C-alpha cells in the first residue's frame, strides 16, 4: 500500500448518477483530447531529434509515463497541459463554472500526483524537467537548451 506524504485527494467518478451531467458535444470534445503525442510533445521531440539526441517516448514502465526519457542520462521530461496540471491554479479554479465538484478535485489530484512523481525521480537520482505546453509552443529553443544543459552536466 502506498504511503502519501499528504492526504490523497479523492476524485468522484464522473457519471450521471453522481450529479455530473455532460452534453453530447462536450463528450465528443473530451474524447478528442490526446493523452500522448500532443502537438507540444511532437514539437519538442522533433527539435530534440534534430539536435542528434535520441530518447524514448512515453516509457510505460517508469512512474508517470514520462513524455520523453533519456535512460542513459537518467533524465525524464514531462510536458504538462496547463489546464490538466493546474497552471495558475488559484486563479483558474475560480473560472470553472460547471461540474466544479468533479473538476476541482480532479485537477488537484493531478497536481498532487505530479508532486509525488517529482519526489520519486529526485529520490532515485534522476533529473526531471517539466515544461508547460505553452512554454514549448512559445519558447521551443529555450526548452531544447534546458534539456541539452541537463544532459551536459550528467557525469
Task: Describe the residue ranges of each PLM region.
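Nucleic-acid endo/exonuclease domains
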Residues: 1-130, 134-155
